[in-house]
Amino acid sequence: MKKVRVLTAEEAALLVNDGDTIATGGFVSCACPEALSKALEKRFLETGHPRDLTLFFAAGQGHRDGTGGDHYGHEGMVKRVIGGHWDRAPKLGDLALSNKIEAYNLPQGVISHMYRDIAAHNIGTITHVGLYTFADPRNGGGKLNDVTKEDLVKVVEIEGQERLLYKAFPINVVFLRASYADEYGNCTVHREIGPIDVTAMAQACKNSGGRVIVQVEKIVQGGSLDPKLVAIPGIYVDSIVVGSIEDLSLIHISEPTRRTPI
């Protein structure tokens, strides 16, 4: 099996192109690929690229202090944001409220299912979730401001029943965080709070022809990981980045003695 490519965060940031759709993992202050997002923000501030990104995420990410999703909160860096929870990234919210970006709020659980449907090359996620709410296109379709025009949600009828179709789209890049990776890119999440969609997100990006980049705590010898703990098989992973201890938690707390050894 071929060994995975190991990059610095700065090198990984160069893999994101203008106009890409990028999905980021994480849940509030946990399991966020902070080193990757910081490096991408730094590149944009220094060079003006990448720009016009579409940012896609389910759970809110960050600590309302410039971390997580707020690394993308710069005019010109993103043109569209599709998220399940916006509260953790006030800079992104300000861009939406000032009509500087196209902005959508879709149900968080639906976005989790969208990753799976994108991976499966389905046309989208069909569900009753969101009917007659803000996500229903008859009530705005999740659009958050006046410059957001495209309908990402459609009402369909199946067997005489109304459902919502949340349309699928390709993902060009995914930033994920895991605990350990082996030399072949197999990644565990045993030291995170949970898997948080990482398997489906990696599959969705890989099956879109995109680039899967995973931030980890450390790289271990191939064959040393318990296969039952592997959440992201190496066949989905393009590059690994080893993050610093400061990037393990957005609230800067690290208690290694309380973590489960592998």
Segments the model singles out, each with a brief description of its role:
Residues 186-210:
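Gly/Ser/Thr-rich active-site loops/lids in small-molecule metabolic enzymes
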Residues 79, 170-172, 210, 238:
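Conserved acidic residues
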Residues 9, 25-27, 32, 53, ...:
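Fold-independent oxyanion-binding glycine-rich loops
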Residues 220-250:
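Terminal amphipathic helices with adjacent charged low-complexity linkers/tails
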Residues 2-108, 258-259:
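N-terminal active-site beta-alpha-beta segment that forms phosphate/nucleotide-binding
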Residues 5, 14-15, 45-50, 72-75, ...:
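Solvent-exposed alpha-helices and their adjacent loops that cap or buttress functional pockets
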Residues 252-262:
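Single conserved hydrophobic/aromatic residue that forms the stacking wall/gate
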Residues 99-188:
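ATP/pyrophosphate-binding catalytic subdomain of soluble kinases
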